[in-house]
């Protein structure tokens, strides 16, 4: 265990060091302007990338544990789609001209999507995992339709920024967004740690968990609530960076399959490393253009998702 943590910490430290050092502009550490670029632009962006990656990975492993389904992640369950739909509608209504309003609407969209998925998946007195996944897929299709209509009605001047946000971007990262996402992630991990033993028992099935005294519906509510809130916050500030919550938990389980309490920080470290590295590549692969982070995570995630689907 200690070796796995050490390896992930070293990889994250290397990724952060490289991401801070390299970019579209070379930094001279003796130059005042370079130090300002580092403190106001590059460092908050790199730390936000780490926070976003950790958040999505923690949400992903929580969804997979609750649903006992290896294909579950915030992107597939419709949480990310709800946030994107909220942002698209806000853009169509020209709310983007009010600073900070689009992320707030996106966050609200993520929470509404979570509530809708839960209501659709509810069956008598329990939540059906299969219905939950199907509900997420159906809602994603609905959100896609609303997004297309919203973009068709959006003013041209706001459309470019909205499209970049949809593809995942950390451009314009601020210390405020770093603190917001990191704080929510810390609170969520503490909350999930308190129900970690119950989540571990849920892996063996709801009936077995109930027989051992677990309040299954309460644990589901806490788990889904915590994972959805941090996902909404992450998507609100970075747009859609898909497949992190799917890819990272599976890779981490190759080295650690036991206690859920230790799986959470391992996934957080792995997710942070992946998104920091993806952001670095998106900034330097083409010098004059910043590519969307979501494209790189999708390139890694789609083949992995298909292999999981085939095995399942």
Predicted regions mapped to residue ranges:
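Alpha-helical transmembrane segments in inner-membrane proteins
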Residues: 1-312
